[in-house]
A protein has these predicted regions:
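Conserved internal helical-beta-strand scaffold that buttresses enzyme catalytic cores
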Residues: 1-248, 258-580
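Hydrophobic positions on the alpha1 helix immediately C-terminal to the Walker A/P-loop
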Residues: 253
Length: 580
């Protein structure tokens, strides 16, 4: 008798009518065969194999270069379950409308069946997904981003316990592009886009939108967080998980290289984007990175900003929408070295130095295996994960938020996370530079009602006897001239020191209306150009700014309606009172 997976594959094939069906095993031979086919069809271009062995370039359709949030839907039975921050479509309507687009969508194409694991093999925290796609580019990326093929098929066996992901490029028309999530049946449908976040269904679709629903049902957390380990000169390692909206330096922090001044300290990378956290027998939260690769933004990445990322992408990586140098190397704005006189831009057109157009798309990407990262943690594949000492929230704020502060307690920390805001960037299609509320950096990724999500966080605080301490950071504070006043990058290690000291019951702090701030000298500034006055400015809590902030938070909370937990309102009122 056919397994649930075989039955589903038959069902999809009857609808989409591919010319053939291929079951992926994840082997190197399969990968090489697919790459050769894509080189022949022009889906991939070969990069300089001496300098970038095993690396290739993909150029996407110019209308298909970022996540399309306005075409991303949560299809819960009741609209209230999706809540006001998500687009909602009734499941029956979604299946009828988008099902029609899938009819015959794979004619003349190969249908690939990709079984994959989210999380290390054999981990109690791991889950299985299967993506059906007509894009070999998706197969090649999923092989990097997940533990794919035989390893997942073995773990699945004949079980029906897997998240179904159906993807087709369709005709790539933005008018016929939809990314649908069915939380009640744990299914994902995506059509009309080949872009990473829309097409690699293990990533945001499963690991956050569907997994956040599973986490709520099963009492764990699925979060848009990096995970890093900080090892002291004495050999003690502390793990932190941090949530920032896009373009706030998540990947850079996850792969931080401690500067020479922080002699003896090491940073270990577990993940740069997603964390799944469960309660451990010891009363702490333990985290795994469900992914196996990095899907990072290329522009701005250099040996100065992220030396580990630059080393990671030197082999076996796929570059999407970057420019290419005359000798066949990937290039983007912000990479090391002089700007070349001539390049081929992300559209495949000749580009000359001084052109007003960007040579690489602002949201151009690299897909690279995590195991190639020089700072990858020895616990990257640990089925148990790692114990988390601190949660760090942050956003890109020019003036309001200080460099770092600590929440008073868990419930206050949930409020701090719930009121995260940042300025928009190229990773979202839409206006750039607008301040948008992005609670826990999950606004585009929470698969259910945001008010219920805050409630779930509050509940987790009661279920975890030794919860992480909660902090907020802002690397992006500016002075009156609009200049960044904190050096950032590797020097962020100094802030992490203070955070770890606070977790250890050390580290001097003073109370402020918004939380605990480092006391004078609490952050070591030896060897950097940050004087006492600058540090004072970095840690200033401007009451007029914060009063405006409480208004803005109140407006956002008001949009969440009856599902907003009363505790969030109480926390906001307490902040208003403390500000006086």
């Amino acid at each position: 008798m056919a397994t649930p997976l075989e039955q589903w594959v038959d069902e999809v094939a009857r609808e989409t009518r591919p010319k053939n069906i291929y079951w992926c095993d994840g082997s190197e031979a399969e990968n090489q065969r697919l790459i050769q086919e894509m080189l022949a069809s022009g889906t991939l271009g070969e990069l300089n194999q001496q300098q970038y062995p095993g690396c290739y370039l993909h150029r996407s359709d110019p209308s298909d270069v970022a996540r399309t949030e306005h075409l991303t839907f949560i299809c819960s039975e009741r609209q209230e379950e999706a809540g006001p921050t998500n687009n909602w479509m009734a499941p029956a309507d979604a299946r009828a409308k988008v099902g029609a687009l899938f009819r015959g969508a794979m004619q003349g194409r190969t249908m690939y069946v990709i079984p994959y694991l989210m999380g290390p093999a054999g981990s109690p925290s791991s889950k299985i997904g299967v993506e059906i796609t007509d894009s070999p580019y998706v197969v090649a990326n999923m092989r990097i981003m997940t533990r794919m093929g035989e390893v997942a098929s073995r773990q699945l066996g004949g079980s029906g316990e897997f998240v179904k992901g159906l993807h087709s490029l369709g005709d790539l028309s933005p008018e016929r592009r939809f990314i649908l999530h069915f939380p009640d049946t744990k299914e994902i449908w995506s059509i009309g886009s080949g872009y990473g976040g829309n097409a690699l269904l293990g990533k945001k679709c499963f690991a956050l939108r569907i997994a956040s629903v599973q986490a709520r049902e099963e009492d764990w957390l699925a979060e848009h967080m990096l995970i890093l380990g900080i090892e002291s000169p004495a050999g003690e390692t502390y793990y932190v998980a941090a949530a920032f909206p896009s373009a706030c330096g998540k990947t850079n922090l996850a792969m931080l290289v401690p500067p020479a001044s922080q002699k003896g300290w090491k940073v270990w990378t577990i993940g740069d984007d997603i964390a799944w956290l469960r309660r451990g027998a010891d009363g702490r939260l333990w985290a795994i990175n469900p992914e196996a690769g990095f899907f990072g933004v290329a522009p701005g990445t250099s040996t100065k900003t992220n030396a580990n990322a630059m080393a990671t992408v030197r082999k076996n990586s796929i570059f999407t929408n970057t420019a290419v140098t005359e000798d066949g190397c990937p290039w983007w704005e912000g990479i090391d070295g002089e700007v070349p006189a001539r390049l081929t831009d992300w559209r495949g057109q000749p580009w000359v130095k001084g052109s007003s157009d960007k040579a690489a798309h602002p949201n151009s990407r690299f897909t690279a295996p995590a195991r190639q990262c020089p700072s990858i943690s020895p616990h990257f594949d640990d089925p148990q994960g790692v114990p988390i000492s601190a949660f760090i929230f942050g956003g890109r704020r020019a003036r309001t938020a200080p460099l770092v502060f600590e929440a008073f307690d868990w419930d206050h920390g949930v409020f701090v996370g719930a009121s995260v805001a940042s300025e928009t960037t190229a990773a979202q299609s839409g206006a750039v530079g607008v301040v948008r509320r992005d609670p826990m950096a999950m606004l585009p990724f929470c698969g259910y009602n945001m008010g219920s999500y805050f409630d779930h966080w509050l509940k987790m605080g009661t279920l975890v006897p030794r919860p992480p301490k909660i902090f907020h950071v802002n690397w992006f504070r500016q002075n009156a001239d609009g200049k960044f006043i904190w050096p950032g990058f590797g020097e962020n290690m100094r802030v992490l020191h203070w955070i770890i000291d606070r977790c250890e019951g050390k580290g001097a702090a003073v109370e402020s209306p918004i939380g605990m701030l480092p006391s004078n000298g609490g952050i070591n500034t030896e060897g950097i150009d940050v004087g006492g006055d600058t540090m004072k400015e970095l840690l200033t809590v401007g009451r007029p700014d914060w009063k405006a902030e409480t208004e803005s938070i109140g407006e956002f909370f008001g949009k969440l309606g009856a599902r907003l937990p009363d505790e969030m309102g109480r926390q906001r009122e307490a902040l208003v009172k403390r500000l006086g």
